[in-house]
């Protein structure tokens, strides 16, 4: 795969395993050669059931630093996992070689693929805002930033669903139910633009134009036939100057997730949680901003019913910024000298397989930055939870680089405190 890097986020480290089906990330921040001046990144997130009994890796990874200190890797690592029979989460997992996955907060450069497994990592989208977003699993209330340039526009509803060939490509479909415009990204409200094997800055002829959905919802549009280059495509297609669905099995552009996860922020500052736009550009630009004292749903994918990659269920992930960043600041492409976006300290994962929701927290292996808060996963009232997952005072309670819980009934809550 040309021009991009694959990184295995430290979910394959001791105690850090969460969701075992594949969530590849390619084409991250990829740009056409005429407009790009920096290296391109692609993230492969692999989360595994913590009770996995065997992990093997092969392949090699090499790093090359750019002028900005960003790394590029030209090789990948394959991993096979033998899932445990029990749905419970084991307290530890045999760590793998450091050349494939980081066993500490030291940045790594590698790619990993799960060939067999039984759980999932997480995806979510949200209305970005500098002020508080208060949401429950059934209701989302948002407020927008006072800066018009950095605002995100929440959309109204459209009961009839999306109509192909009606909207101009330059007219973001903000009246569609659940769709959220990310105006501050500069793509005309879209979350990302893909043209051929590159990326663009506007929704033009032949482009896939991706979009964000409200908290607790997932986008429904991606072509059933994905390219052989391993880079995912997603969003609406611009054809003849008009927008068309790429997945006509859905009338609406957004659908509700499984509904088994949420975020509760008990801090005095807001936290920007940034979902990767997958399938699609795979940049971490779809924000969930949870203000101090607020709650928000977190979208959870269903392995059996959501996007399939080469016949395997896929998950999603969130980059979790330090408290104090707005969505507009934190859900942007960062650099190694920063501590936001892809360089934010933590990564959340969530997804469902066979009725069990797997939720995880892990250290972002790209950085040694530590979160300026504590966070744990707890069960909502009446939930059945296996395992413990706590990040407190700069370390994981289990002594590893991450942790996972399995929820067989009810829902889980990521609690900032």
UniProtKB/Swiss-Prot annotation:
InterPro entries found in the cross-reference section: Beta-Glucosidase_SUN, SUN
Chain ranges passing through the membrane: none
Subcellular localization, as worded in the UniProt entry: Secreted, Cell wall
EC number: 3.2.1.-
Domain of life according to the entry: Eukaryota
Record key words, sorted: Carbohydrate metabolism, Cell wall, Cell wall biogenesis/degradation, Glycosidase, Hydrolase, Polysaccharide degradation, Secreted, Signal
GO MF term list: beta-glucosidase activity
Keyword field contains Cell division: no
One Pfam match: SUN
Signal peptide: 1-18
UniProt GO cellular component terms: cell surface; extracellular region; fungal-type cell wall
Keyword S-adenosyl-L-methionine annotated: no
GO biological process, any: fungal-type cell wall organization or biogenesis
Main location: secreted
Function, in words: Involved in cell wall synthesis. May be required for the activation of 1,3-beta-glucan synthase.
UniProt similarity note: Belongs to the SUN family.
Protein name (database record): Probable secreted beta-glucosidase PSU1
Annotated source species: Schizosaccharomyces pombe (strain 972 / ATCC 24843)
This protein's encoding gene: psu1
């Amino acid at each position: 795969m040309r021009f991009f890097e694959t990184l295995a986020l430290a979910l394959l480290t001791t105690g850090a395993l969460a969701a075992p089906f594949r969530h590849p990330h390619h084409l991250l921040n990829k740009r056409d050669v005429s407009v790009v001046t920096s290296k391109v990144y692609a993230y492969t997130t692999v989360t595994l059931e913590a009770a996995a009994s065997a992990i093997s890796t092969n392949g090699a990874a090499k790093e090359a630093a750019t002028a900005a200190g960003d790394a590029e890797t030209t090789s990948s690592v394959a991993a096979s996992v033998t899932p445990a029979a029990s749905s419970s989460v084991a307290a530890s997992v045999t760590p793998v070689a450091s050349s494939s996955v980081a066993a500490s907060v030291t940045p790594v450069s590698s790619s990993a693929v799960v060939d067999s497994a039984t759980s999932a990592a997480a995806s979510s989208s949200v209305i970005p805002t500098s002020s508080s977003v208060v949401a429950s699993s059934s209701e989302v209330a948002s407020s927008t930033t006072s800066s018009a340039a950095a605002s995100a526009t929440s959309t109204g509803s459209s009961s009839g669903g999306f109509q192909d060939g009606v909207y101009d490509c330059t007219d973001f479909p903000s009246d569609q139910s659940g769709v959220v415009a990310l105006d501050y990204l500069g793509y005309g409200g879209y979350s990302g633009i893909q043209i051929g094997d590159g990326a663009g800055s506007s929704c033009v002829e032949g482009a896939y134009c991706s979009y964000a959905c409200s908290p607790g919802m997932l986008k429904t549009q991606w072509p059933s036939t994905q390219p052989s280059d391993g880079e995912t495509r997603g969003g609406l297609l611009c054809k003849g100057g008009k927008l068309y669905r790429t997945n006509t099995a859905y009338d609406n552009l957004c659908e509700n997730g499984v509904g088994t996860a949420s975020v509760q922020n008990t801090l005095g500052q807001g936290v920007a949680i940034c979902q990767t736009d997958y399938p699609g550009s795979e940049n971490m630009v779809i924000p969930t901003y949870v203000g101090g004292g607020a709650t928000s749903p977190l979208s959870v994918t269903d392995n059996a019913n959501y996007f399939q990659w080469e016949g395997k269920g896929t998950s999603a992930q969130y980059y979790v910024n330090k408290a104090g960043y707005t969505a507009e600041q934190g859900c942007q492409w960062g650099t190694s000298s920063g501590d936001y976006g892809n360089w934010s300290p933590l990564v959340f994962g969530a997804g469902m397989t066979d009725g069990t929701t797997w939720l995880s927290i892990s250290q972002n292996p790209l950085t040694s930055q530590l979160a300026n808060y504590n966070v744990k996963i707890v069960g909502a009232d009446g939930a059945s939870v296996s395992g413990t997952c706590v990040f407190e005072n700069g370390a994981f309670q289990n002594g590893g680089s991450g942790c996972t819980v399995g929820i067989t009934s009810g829902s889980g809550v990521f609690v900032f405190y």
